């Protein structure tokens, strides 16, 4: 598995990077994990979500917030500096369990990452992503083309979650956003530390599929 840190990159540019790599991975290239932070952007998934946006295009444009249609699954969400986004461009044709197992394993990567930092999170049946009670700390939305995944997960790290005030998170009125720093009440964990742990968990889960789900590999 290759891991490439894209630094800060616009949503459209990151999607172009993924789709270019997808063609290579789907024909035998090595699975590739991209890590990135995006400038402020609100994205709409294949399930729509414009009805859950509470600001007009003019309001967003004045504040430098992009609005983008995405090919990923799911509803509305947002990305911003201080949120770690991971895009696994992985071939899943021969992976046991197919896309359902892949999605479960993405959640497992995040659960183990948070556990490393002392946070116990969980899955919620029927509500994709990773949660701490009713607070969503990580959104997940993927797309598949030619048996190869793209898009992925967005883990909130920093305290500033103000962009979420402009949307109904994932179309769920009772859900609220949270982050690693908020839950720890401690801002000392760096983005690089989170990247390092998340990458290790991707390696543990996706290159060692025999490891039982839920068994910490810390």
Curated annotation (Swiss-Prot):
Biological processes annotated in GO: protein modification process
Chief site of localization: cytoplasm
Reactions mediated catalytically: octanoyl-[ACP] + L-lysyl-[protein] = N(6)-octanoyl-L-lysyl-[protein] + holo-[ACP] + H(+)
Pfam families the UniProt entry points to: LplA-B_cat
Record-given protein name: Octanoyltransferase
UniProt-listed Gene3D superfamilies: Bira Bifunctional Protein, Domain 2
EC class: transferase
Any one GO MF annotation of this record: lipoyl(octanoyl) transferase activity
Protein's cellular compartments: Cytoplasm
Organism: Nitratidesulfovibrio vulgaris (strain ATCC 29579 / DSM 644 / CCUG 34227 / NCIMB 8303 / VKM B-1760 / Hildenborough) (Desulfovibrio vulgaris)
Site (Lowers pKa of active site Cys): 136
Record: active site: 170 (acyl-thioester intermediate)
Domain BPL/LPL catalytic span(s) in chain numbering: 27-210
Pathway noted in the entry: Protein modification; protein lipoylation via endogenous pathway; protein N(6)-(lipoyl)lysine from octanoyl-[acyl-carrier-protein]: step 1/2
Keywords, in A-Z order: Acyltransferase, Cytoplasm, Transferase
NCBIfam families (UniProt xref): lipB
Family, similarity comment: Belongs to the LipB family.
Residues that bind substrate: 72-79, 139-141, 152-154
Note, other: In the reaction, the free carboxyl group of octanoic acid is attached via an amide linkage to the epsilon-amino group of a specific lysine residue of lipoyl domains of lipoate-dependent enzymes.
GO terms for cellular component: cytoplasm
Membrane-spanning ranges: none
Keyword Magnesium: no
Transferase among keywords: yes
Matches recorded under InterPro entries: aa-tRNA-synth_II/BPL/LPL, BPL_LPL_catalytic, Octanoyltransferase, Octanoyltransferase_CS
CDD domains in the cross-refs: LipB
């Amino acid at each position: 598995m290759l891991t490439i840190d894209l630094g800060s990159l616009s949503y459209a540019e990151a999607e172009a990077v993924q789709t270019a790599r997808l063609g290579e991975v789907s024909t035998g290239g090595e699975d590739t994990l991209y890590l990135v932070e995006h400038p402020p952007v609100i994205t709409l998934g294949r399930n729509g979500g414009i009805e859950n946006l509470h600001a007009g295009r003019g309001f967003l444009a004045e504040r430098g917030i992009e609005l983008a249609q995405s090919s990923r699954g799911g509803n509305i969400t947002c990305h911003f500096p201080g949120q770690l986004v991971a895009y696994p461009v992985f071939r899943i044709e021969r992976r046991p369990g197919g896309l359902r197992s892949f999605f479960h394993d993405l959640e497992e990567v995040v659960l183990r990452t948070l556990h490393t930092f002392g946070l116990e999170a969980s899955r919620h049946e029927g509500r994709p992503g990773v949660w701490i009670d009713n607070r969503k700390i990580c959104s997940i939305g993927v797309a598949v083309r030619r048996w190869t995944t793209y898009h992925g997960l967005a883990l909130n790290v920093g305290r500033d979650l103000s962009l979420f005030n402009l949307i109904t998170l994932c179309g769920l009125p009772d859900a609220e956003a949270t982050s690693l720093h908020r839950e720890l009440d401690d801002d000392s964990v760096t983005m690089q530390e989170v990247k390092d742990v998340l990458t290790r968990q991707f390696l543990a889960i996706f290159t060692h599929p025999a490891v039982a789900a839920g068994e910490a590999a810390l």
